[in-house]
Amino acid sequence: MKNLNKNFLYTFLHRWLGDGLLTSKGPMWQKRRKILTPAFHFSILLQFVDVFNRETKNFNNLIERQYLNQPIDVMPIISDFTLATMSETSMGTKVNLLTKTGLKYKSAIQELGNMIMKRSTTPWLWWQKLFDLSPLRKIEKKDLEVLHNFTTNIIVEKSRNFKTFDDHFDESVTKRKYPLMDILLNAKFRHKGIDDTAIRNEVDTFMFEGHDTVATCLGFTTMLFAVHSDFQREVYQEIVNILGTDLANKPTYANLQEMSLLERCIKESLRLYPPVPVMGRKTNDEISTKFGVIPKDVNVFIHLYDMHRNPDLWLNPDKFDPSRHLPENSQNRHTYAYIPFSAGPRNCIGQRFAMLEIKAFFCGLLRKFVLEPVDTPETLSLIQEIILRSQNGIRVKFTLRQ
């Protein structure tokens, strides 16, 4: 397989994520991908719908208690939602943001993420020796201690009485939830070539990749539903047609799979606002293209934000139009014209997980509230870092649905 290596910017993550799936390469990457694949099996995803529904209900209760009928920046509370879901599904332990330990973990993961983004946009900090002399190194060291200790303590605790299980999952697996850490511990105790450090790296990678990216999608999609009230009404009707109006009826995996309009709206949000707006690769070999030859050992960047709005690929590219993702409208589109989850062998291993979480969130949110616009695409001040962000937040108004 050619050109599977990430480019040099990903080395900034090594002290945090080690040789996790995001940063590893070659045989190591292939081995880890094989070990991790069972964690995203259909039968495992079935079990996580309960987690998504419960945390969505908690999110809705928070909105109803504190934020009704007023403009609020949704990003901080959405970030807390994804932190809760990701910690429970990856570690089997929900980060309690009301405790000192939980608050330290939340602060560290956000601070370290911001530090990496700062470094990625400051060329003189790309050199390791200069970075280590900068004040950012002190922040990195402090935050890594918090994050690594948190994950390591859970690994040690779970290892004490861990019982191995058959990892050939099928639809009958319903009794026990299998968070990512359990899948990895099972691989360790069944001697599949993974140790505690590698387990920590993979769990931390999942937290890093899944927390901010999903939160970004949820934030921008919330704004788009508020702005486009016609689609908000249509999606709400789709949900009612499947679940009825009784909020006690929680969506199942099968219910969420039926929500095709909701999925198209999410896909269109990911086109307009890809959470990871730029991806990087390093060429292993010389590549010939119609524009010329790309030499070996060159860092190549793929600008998803621009590609997803390229008028040569998309009619009226800045328009929110979920019908683009109907099968009849996308079947002739180039395979790599739309890649919010990357593409090829190194695509996002958790993309089905992410889509399920996002659909469960909006299924619960739109049944409870009407979203009214405060910010619009025109008022946002976007910044492209490792994660796409709005500098001035994303404000929405929530009113109870009658």
What is each PLM-predicted segment?
Residues 82, 86, 90-91, 143-151, ...:
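Central I-helix of cytochrome P450 enzymes
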Residues 43-54, 64-88, 96-105, 126-150, ...:
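Cytochrome P450
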Residues 2, 229-232, 351-388:
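Cytochrome P450 heme-binding "Cys pocket" and the immediately downstream C-terminal segment
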Residues 14, 41-43, 143-218, 248-255, ...:
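Conserved cytochrome P450 catalytic core segment spanning the I/J/K helices
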Residues 18, 57, 72-97, 110-113, ...:
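Hydrophobic mid-domain F-helix/FG-region of cytochrome P450s
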Residues 302-330:
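Conserved cytochrome P450 K-helix/beta-meander segment immediately N-terminal to the heme-binding cysteine loop
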Residues 1-51, 55, 73-74, 78-87, ...:
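Cytochrome P450 substrate-recognition site 1
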Residues 17, 22, 38, 209, ...:
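Cytochrome P450 heme-thiolate "Cys pocket" and heme-binding signature region
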